[in-house]
Structure formats: structure tokens, C-alpha cells
Amino acid sequence: MNNSKESPEIRFAVLIDGDNAQPSLVADVLKEVAKYGKITIRRVYGDWTSRQMETWKKHLPQNAVQPIQQFRNTVGKNATDSAMIIDAMDLLYGGNVEGFAIVSSDSDYTRLAIRLREDGKFVIGIGKMQTPEPFVRACDLFVYTENLVKP
């Protein structure tokens, strides 16, 4: 009988802003998050009817990432951000994950990261070096995508 008191592995939801992340780095992003726990949810949000999302399509099946459709109903509004935030809150209250990885360089996720941390969740942010400082600081850990790219 094993009496070791190892802490349980953190279950992560990886939520990717498809309008604001690089498809070619999906495998590297998932590998990075897996260092901190088990990834149980992998989603990328965007308007899959737009040409902008075409480059994502080959990376989805290779990395077992679920595409989440969000139509752009109004020009100038980012419906993707709203959909991702709503799903994150649903996951928070569902209680099936202890950690979140928010993949975006968008400061609109700052309040979400703060709220998730207030509830005791571990938050990893992943984005470009140009990511606004408030979002970076709102996360427990922030990984710059430039550091994921192999030379």
C-alpha cells in the first residue's frame, strides 16, 4: 500500500483566443502547460467561417483541440473574448479544473485572470512579449511565446 501524500495533479483548461494567438505554436503551448498539470480541456475560440481561422484547421486534430464557433455579429466588437470569458466562468463554477491557461496577448483577459485567482485557481497566461503588463501581472505565471520558439 502506498502511503505517500503526493499532491494531486492540477487539471487545466487551455483556452486559446484564436484571433490573437499563433496556430503554429499550439503544440508548444500545450507542452508548456503540461509541465504544470494535466490538460483536460483544450479549446480555441474564433469565427471559423472567416479566412483568418484557416491556418488553425490543420493544427486542431494534431493537438486534439476543440474549435469553438463564435460569429462576429458586430464590426469592432470582439465576440471571441466574450465567449471565452463566459466559458471560463462556466468551467470555474463546474469545479472540474484547478488551473486555467489563457492563451492571448489581449489585456481584455486581465479581469478574468484576477477573478479566477480570487477563487483559488492557478492561472497561466501565454502570449507575445507585447502583452500589456496588467494581464501579465494578473496571472500566477506568464510565458512569452517568443520563449517557446526554438532557435
Q: What are these model-derived regions, one by one?
A:
Residues M1-Y93, I114-R115, F122:
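Domain-level signal for Mg2+-assisted phosphodiester chemistry and nucleotide/NA-binding surfaces
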Residues N20, W48, A79, S104-S107, ...:
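Short beta->alpha linker loops
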Residues A21-P23, T110, Y144:
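General alpha-helical segment detector with a strong preference for membrane-spanning helices
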Residues M84, S107-Y109:
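Short acidic loop-to-helix transition motifs that present clustered carboxylates
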Residues A113-Y144:
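VWA/integrin I-like adhesion module and closely mimicked acidic/polar interface patches used
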